[in-house]
Amino acid sequence: MIFQIGIENNNEGYRSITWALEHPGCFSYGSNAETALTALPVAISDYADWIGLHEPSWVLGDQVELHVADTWTDYYIDKHFDRLPGSDYYLVDAWFQYDWKPLTGIDIERGDKLLAWSRADLLGVVQRLSATKLDQAYPGERWTINGILKHVSNAERWYMDRIGYPVNTNKNDVLENSFMRLEAIRKHFLDVLPRLEGLQKTIGVDGEFWSPRKVLRRALWHERDHTEHIRKLIGR
């Protein structure tokens, strides 16, 4: 099976991500493009198996042919949209040629399923944790687990705002309880998703390009990434 790949370098200033562009939620990391690309076949196999837990997988992960379609290097800009080195400024993340493509009906149908499975995985990891564990601080970590959950929902809210579908409340007003916040913002996301089918919409916001396809790609990556993040914290 042929996979169209996007390579994103300098992600968060220190790593590379390889994205299976036709399969949101499928990605791998590395210290550079080469190591990230080397890790991708295993990530594709795991992704196919993950889908297969729920229904016959539409991804064939045993015969993988990678075609690098696009490469991007993240960079920082200031409020004047000038590129500057250093992490004190806004980091512009990857915009691939593939992100221009409007979402199809199949993309929407599969995206809805992937979002449901990803959310079930996240909740399966955290739902039985005590309040103490949810609010436990971890050395070297920016957030508690509760903080990560709020970050996941706030990011999803932010993604939708990028393409002109904001949640109609202030971020701090969207339910203090992290589980209720996750549910409320995801409901908005799922309500909007069918309206994005076939929509030829690309918006530049704060120096970065966004489209419905990029939003779906980023939302699934972000939740799956932080689900693994939380698993690692619990295992400490």
Task: Show which residues each predicted segment covers.
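A general marker of short, structured functional hotspots
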Residues: 43, 71-72, 85-86, 185, ...
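A short mid-domain helix/strand-loop element embedded in enzyme catalytic domains
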Residues: 87-105, 112-135, 154-163
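Short, contiguous alpha-helical
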Residues: 3-33, 37-56, 60-67, 75-78, ...
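Acidic/histidine-rich alpha-helical segments that form the ligand environment
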Residues: 101-128, 174-203, 210, 214-222
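Short alpha-helical hairpin
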Residues: 13-20, 86-98, 198-199
